[in-house]
């Protein structure tokens, strides 16, 4: 059901990235998402970073409008929706790229996990949106494309070197990164938060199809085994249904 919530707090997290805290706390499983509606603009899905928190990158008209809102302004939300991450025993890797950090942050904070290694990458130091995730993990490994922070390279470079350490790999980020994670792990011991263009968020419109699945209903979190043989990392679909190559 659509309901109005107030923006209780908002602040800059990184370059072109803002956090928005609402005046209502939601019961959710890390990996689930909400649909956020701006009247007269549109409605978009956002993964929850916390019970009352989303973290957003400015990428188009919708997010540009959202960035203009201030504390005390109102937005409309529904959800949470979808399937979230499932906790496993042992040492795990939390792999995030760019703005893929929100569901990974939620998992680090609320997941019933024994030992957590965060492997997080961005283009540059100014684009790292770590929040305070270091308080909820046992180890932090940072990578940047340009070497301005941490290791120069990509999160998947680190994962490839250390994959035998982990009983499970959780990942969210650009789809090409997710495809590489699946390749490195041979589609085993992985849970991936996938993204597709989404309209309804409740499994009716079919716009978020990924192989035989609907991301909003069957995901957004999938196991590697589920994604084997799908188009993950190869192509996605634009709002009008046309195919967009990811290679």
Swiss-Prot record:
Coiled coil regions in record: none
Binding site for [2Fe-2S] cluster: 200, 205, 208, 216
BP terms from Gene Ontology: 'de novo' UMP biosynthetic process
Occurrences of domain FAD-binding FR-type (ranges): 1-87
Keywords associated with the record: 2Fe-2S, Electron transport, FAD, Flavoprotein, Iron, Iron-sulfur, Metal-binding, Pyrimidine biosynthesis, Transport
Entry note: cofactor: Binds 1 [2Fe-2S] cluster per subunit. Binds 1 FAD per subunit.
InterPro entries the UniProt entry points to: Cyt_c3_hydrogenase_gsu, Dihydroorotate_DH_ele_sf, Dihydroorotate_DH_Fe-S-bd, Dihydroorotate_DHASE_ETsu, FAD-bd_FR_type, FNR_nucleotide-bd, PyrK_electron_transfer, Riboflavin_synthase-like_b-brl
Cofactor: [2Fe-2S] cluster; FAD
GO molecular function: 2 iron, 2 sulfur cluster binding; electron transfer activity; flavin adenine dinucleotide binding; metal ion binding; oxidoreductase activity
NAD listed as a keyword: no
Listed Pfam families: DHODB_Fe-S_bind
Entry superkingdom: Archaea
Pathway field: Pyrimidine metabolism; UMP biosynthesis via de novo pathway; orotate from (S)-dihydroorotate (NAD(+) route): step 1/1
Function: Responsible for channeling the electrons from the oxidation of dihydroorotate from the FMN redox center in the PyrD type B subunit to the ultimate electron acceptor NAD(+).
Subunit structure: Heterotetramer of 2 PyrK and 2 PyrD type B subunits.
HAMAP family: DHODB_Fe_S_bind (MF_01211)
PANTHER family: DIHYDROOROTATE DEHYDROGENASE B (NAD(+)), ELECTRON TRANSFER SUBUNIT, DIHYDROOROTATE DEHYDROGENASE B (NAD(+)), ELECTRON TRANSFER SUBUNIT-RELATED
Record-linked NCBIfam families: PRK00054.1-1 (NF000796)
Family as reported in the entry's similarity comment: Belongs to the PyrK family.
Protein name: Probable dihydroorotate dehydrogenase B (NAD(+)), electron transfer subunit
Name of encoding gene: pyrK
């Amino acid at each position: 059901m659509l309901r109005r919530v107030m923006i209780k707090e908002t602040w800059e997290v990184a370059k072109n990235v803002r956090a928005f805290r609402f005046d209502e706390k939601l019961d959710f499983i890390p990996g689930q998402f909400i649909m956020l509606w701006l009247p007269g603009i549109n409605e978009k899905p956002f993964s929850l970073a916390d019970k009352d928190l989303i973290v957003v990158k400015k990428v188009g008209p919708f997010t540009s409008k959202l960035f203009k809102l201030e504390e005390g302004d109102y937005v409309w939300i529904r959800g949470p929706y979808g399937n979230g991450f499932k906790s496993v025993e042992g040492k795990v890797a939390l792999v995030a790229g760019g703005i893929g950090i929100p569901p990974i942050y939620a998992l680090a904070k609320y997941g019933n996990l024994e030992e957590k290694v965060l492997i997080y990458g961005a283009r540059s130091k100014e684009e790292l949106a770590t929040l305070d995730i270091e308080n909820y993990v046992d180890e932090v490994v940072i990578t940047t494309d340009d070497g301005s922070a941490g290791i120069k390279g990509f999160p998947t470079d680190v994962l490839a070197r250390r994959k035998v350490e982990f009983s499970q790999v959780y990942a969210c980020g650009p789809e090409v990164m997710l495809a590489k994670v699946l390749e490195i792990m041979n589609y085993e011991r992985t849970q991936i938060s996938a993204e597709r263009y989404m309209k309804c968020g409740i499994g009716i419109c079919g716009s978020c199809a990924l192989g035989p699945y609907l991301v909003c209903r069957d995901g957004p979190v999938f196991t590697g085994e589920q994604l084997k043989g799908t188009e993950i990392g190869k192509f996605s679909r634009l709002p009008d249904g046309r195919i967009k190559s990811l290679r």
